[in-house]
Amino acid sequence: MAPQQNIMKQLQQMQSSPYPSSSPSSTTVSQNNDNLNHNVHSLNNSSNNNNNNNNNNNNNNNNNNNNNNNNNNNNNNNNNNNNSINEKNKINDNNNRGNSDDGNNNNSNNNSNNNNSNNNNRDDEEEEGDDEDNNNNNNSNNNKIRGYNDNNDINDIFSINFSSWSKSKDNLIENGVLIFEESGLYKELNLSKSSILNFLSIVASSYRNNPFHSFNHAIAVTQTIFLILLKTNLFNILSPIEKLSIIIASICHDLDHPALSNRFQINMKSSIAVLYNNKSVLENHHLSICLGILESKIGNELLSTLTVEEKKQFFRRVKILILATDMENHFTYKKQFDDIISTFSWDNSEHRDLLLIMFLKSADISNELRSFDISNKWANALMEEFFNQSDLEKLNNLPLTPFMEREKVVLHLTQVSFIEKFLLPSYQSLQNLLPSLEDFVQRIIENKEIWSNNGSSSSTTSSSPN
């Protein structure tokens, strides 16, 4: 069996049903103060919190209405200020770009030549004039990513130096709304801005205020996905359902993260470790929370315009994408992707799925794409989580995780090692298929060199963010 078939078969075994199963009953992981003093919320508890936040969502809707005009003005400013990036496309022009398993049968080479929007014969197709306007907006943004020295403002989703550190939760939600809008999904799937706002608000409330694994991280990862799709011109190639799937998965991939790793959950014999048989414990937990939100009233409103088949494909992709963020399986996915590069076909749905997986996995560890000062902040945040876990491991007489021990970690060396082992090879593989990502690879190399010559205590840690 071909390597890509192996991995897709493995992924598809997670659930044969086209729709998500009901959420597991009470997955509360409750340790007392002598053990962890840290709870991993159950899906039921998360649902209760979601209900409590509905009133807040209504307030956010009102605030969003006031901000819409500002968003539009900022979008125009983004378009005017963006620096054009030359797109180099290694993929042969005679490759058919597109039949995915979403029933999108009309994608072809005309997608890149004519920059047609990817509406794919939806029943409620937009009027021709609106479609042309949407295409023009997409084209004005494609391959226009702000330079490395730009200031970050509240709506600067086009900047490689996007930073969520100084942003409030409302600002981050606004960034998320803009990413949906600039991705073309409003018109392609007839999504309403209010449903997206409500969804993002409930997602934001389902993240904990961790040093690293927080809503800030989720939006940073999602913005990286946005930049990748923009820079590679894949907004004009991927189907609307593929785009929706990876954006939703990016935003939700660390929901209710306890800032304690899979290894810790397993060694502690936590409730979620038992529930998921010690396999991708946190990733399954994040997925459960995500599916609970998507199955709620707010989720149903968000997906109300999708057909039955589109929902089936959407849920399938969200599942495989979130589960793929388990770094224990990193090299397996990397090898599977490398094996298909030379024969990659846009007509092969498994190839497309694996490409999306590599996008999300790479974006999840992409702090080194930012300027050094921004990535340095992420470094310290992740180290804070790691050191806290190490303290708890000692307190509970658990096996110590080597790269988390305060006394042994040399941060700049740890960072260089991670870049060389995980981050850089991932982006180099993506560049082999999509040459326009060369700038991203060069930025990673530049930051690696800074770490190589830096013995300070500051470092951008990228060790397994699970």
Swiss-Prot record:
Cofactors, names only: a divalent metal cation
Cofactor binding annotation: Binds 2 divalent metal cations per subunit. Site 1 may preferentially bind zinc ions, while site 2 has a preference for magnesium and/or manganese ions.
Disordered: annotated span: 1-150
Pfam family, one: PDEase_I
UniProt EC number: 3.1.4.35
Active-site residues annotated for this sequence: 213
Residues noted as binding a divalent metal cation 1 in the record, renumbered to the chain: 217, 253-254, 364
Role summary: Phosphodiesterase specific for cGMP, which is not activated by cGMP. Involved in the degradation of intracellular cGMP.
Family stated for the protein in its record: Belongs to the cyclic nucleotide phosphodiesterase family.
Protein name (record): cGMP-specific 3',5'-cGMP phosphodiesterase 3
